[in-house]
Amino acid sequence: MIKRRINADELELEERVVQINRVSKVVKGGRRFSFSTVVVVGDGKGHVGIGMGKAAEVPEAIRKGVEAAKKNLIRVPLSGTTIPHEVQMEFAASKVRLLPAAPGTGVIAGRGVRPVLEMAGIKDVLSKRYGSNNPINVVKATFKALSALTSLEEQARMRGMTPRELNLRRMRREPAPQEA
């Protein structure tokens, strides 16, 4: 399956800085300071990307992060205002679990998870973060979880069903038919 790269110029992307971190390198003459940023971009309609930027000045680090995020865009399948199914993913020591929620619930998420979900256009979702709360790892785990989502149509195709049959089974919580 070949993934097509999403053209960022065709989308109206918003950007949000998740973290700005001052880092230092110790050299013979003292410390050299620079800045590291984590940036999330998205159009609020199912496209989201994350990027990291490093530079001597904050605006330059943010610009580099935005450029990296635009090169790293993915399409997130939405089911109305929420996600199509539960997903759990980990990155390093951070684990993120995302659950679909009823309309009107809102984005129940902490720092690191919330900006990624909001930039993707997800309005109703429950989330739980386990393990490390390092913002970089949490953002990457969330991004990985969103990229693992499959649409209702794709799930039905994989199971040899129509989306309507799959949805009806979910609503009734019927077990899959057993073959003799």
Swiss-Prot record:
Which terms does the record give in the GO molecular function aspect? Answer: rRNA binding; structural constituent of ribosome
Q: Kinase among the record's keywords? A: no
Q: Keyword Nucleotide-binding: yes or no?
A: no
UniProt GO BP: translation
Q: Kindly give the Pfam families that the UniProt entry links to this protein.
A: Ribosomal_S5, Ribosomal_S5_C
Q: Which family does it belong to?
A: Belongs to the universal ribosomal protein uS5 family.
Assembly behavior: Part of the 30S ribosomal subunit. Contacts proteins S4 and S8.
Q: What does this protein do?
A: With S4 and S12 plays an important role in translational accuracy.
Read off the domain note.
The N-terminal domain interacts with the head of the 30S subunit; the C-terminal domain interacts with the body and contacts protein S4. The interaction surface between S4 and S5 is involved in control of translational fidelity.
Q: What is this protein called?
A: Small ribosomal subunit protein uS5
Q: Which organism is it from?
A: Roseiflexus sp. (strain RS-1)
